Amino acid sequence: MTLFGQEHVERYRATDGEEGHEWRGTQTLLLTTTGRRSGEPRTTPLIYAPAGEDQYTVIASKGGSDAPPAWYLNLAEDPEVEVQIKDDRFRARARTAGPDEKPAMWETMAAEWPDYDEYQLKTSREIPVVVLERLRS
């Protein structure tokens, strides 16, 4: 699968990740945030890595743009999100990784997608690492 965007989201959902979970040698999840202006759900496919029990790491890179991705800005308004990994859908709380944990998480993510290091060189902003922590009922 070479897509990444709305069609990626639609195929991922329709097949419970059979199409879309594996993407260019990586694994992706679907992150649904609440739009900070619209209040509407916004879903984005993102490369991820497990970060411990019930935790997953994603990178707010936007390809090295000087502006952060909209989904990251949405988290500032409402850190409670929905995550889908294959057929597993769950609520999670998102937080930006702290300075003590970020280097190891960044290294793990850059091993998954080496372009992250290049993205950081392209921008003056510090690209955040985001931790998604599954919420238990």
Predicted regions and their residues:
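N-terminal short leaders/motifs
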Residues: M1-G5, T33-E40, E80-R89
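Short, structured beta-strand-loop surface elements
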Residues: S61-Y116, K122-E126, R134
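Short strand-connecting beta-turns/loops that link adjacent beta-strands
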Residues: A51-E53, D88, S137
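Extreme N-terminal tail/first-helix region
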Residues: M1-Q27
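Short beta-strand segments
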Residues: T26-S61
